[in-house]
Amino acid sequence: MEKLEIAFEPMLGDDVRQHVMEGLHAFNYVATGQDEHYPANFTLRGEAGDVLGGLLGYVWGRWLHVTYLWLAEPARGGGYGSRLIGQAEAYARKRGAVGSTLETYSFQARPFYESLGYQVCGQIDDYPPGHTKFILKKALA
């Protein structure tokens, strides 16, 4: 076998990131038969086009996974977070998703997600120290 090296690369190039993701998707397809992977990214922009928030996620295996949801301070409390989630869920339903999953922390938005029908299905205590990480899910079908 050829000699292999592990390299720390804090700034991966897009080509390397894409190669790793494609390898994982191929592996997952063999194991699950699920090949369809849809990006589910939505932005909230001001009149000048500046980004005031966004939701980054994807649909795979008939589930929406919300990876990130963020709103700039001036956009919070105006219903935009709910609208971003709603748009992502509608997009996912059109692609056959039956559920949605996301993660949040005790210092972030658990009550917000619960108000939208998400339920805690797992947690990791003391991550980061003094806080809790929550895994939530919601049925979409």
Describe the residue ranges of each PLM region.
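Conserved GNAT acetyl-CoA-binding A-motif
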Residues: 92-105
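Conserved N-terminal entry element of GNAT/NAT acetyltransferase domains
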Residues: 1-12
